[in-house]
Amino acid sequence: MSKSHPRWRLAKKILTWLFFIAVIVLLVVYAKKVDWEEVWKVIRDYNRVALLSAVGLVVVSYLIYGCYDLLARFYCGHKLAKRQVMLVSFICYAFNLTLSTWVGGIGMRYRLYSRLGLPGSTITRIFSLSITTNWLGYILLAGIIFTAGVVELPDHWYVDQTTLRILGIGLLMIIAVYLWFCAFAKHRHMTIKGQKLVLPSWKFALAQMLISSVNWMVMGAIIWLLLGQSVNYFFVLGVLLVSSIAGVIVHIPAGIGVLEAVFIALLAGEHTSKGTIIAALLAYRVLYYFIPLLLALICYLLLESQAKKLRAKNEAAM
């Protein structure tokens, strides 16, 4: 069936509305899981300087994440305007954090980039590079912090300190292997399910690691500020890294419950009180997840309304 066929156009409209309704339903379900009275009480009681600093770092983090797609723009060689790339990246990241990688990382990227005129093969390369960049920074930081023994694990926990150090060494070996391939591999092209991927240069790989590592460190700094700076920053960052991989394994949208469980298990007691941890993470979820998601929803609707005009402009420029 031709893409210009009336039935095809109708099917696309129906699917778009079904997707939009599904997003609204997921938002409502997520909102019901949050104790909003406690959230606003926590925010009202926060030190204003710490809260404003945290808000500023949230903005910085989302801007840094936008650089992942700018790296992908350079990697793929597509000509979409940088502001369009940053906007799509912001929308996708906000949806990805709260509604899973399938919705934000994959679904939204394919939807928006295709609406702006990019072919599916290019979008696949953008997504692949973006997710690789994100986890390269994670692997590098986690490797350093786990190997250094910064995270103090309780005796009753699932893994011991030695296992975590071995894991850290393994992660650093992954980084070393990736850099070696980027620097010395002779065969730099690979095809995965019909999609051609090209191994980047070692300088590009270093840029991926640097940008992503800074983003993870900014995320850790947000929680550290909201905890009142009462705990060592690198310990907080290490706990965030542990909770992030736990969230991926459990695979719950927004890691609801996982983030809190890991932070309470590793921080509560001699480091800080359970109430302080819960309050900080409630504020973190509002600032880093929920408010950006609401803004992203508005941006998504605006971008959808302008997509046809922007696509025509992009195709003329290409």
UniProtKB/Swiss-Prot annotation:
Residues in compartment: Periplasmic: 1-13, 72-85, 147-165, 227-233, 276-277
Any matching Pfam family: LPG_synthase_TM
Cystine pairs: none
Keywords: Cell inner membrane, Cell membrane, Membrane, Transmembrane, Transmembrane helix
Intracellular or extracellular location(s): Cell inner membrane
Transmembrane spans: 14-34, 51-71, 86-106, 126-146, 166-186, 206-226, 234-254, 255-275, 278-298
Family: To Synechocystis PCC 6803 slr0712.
Protein name: Inner membrane protein YbhN
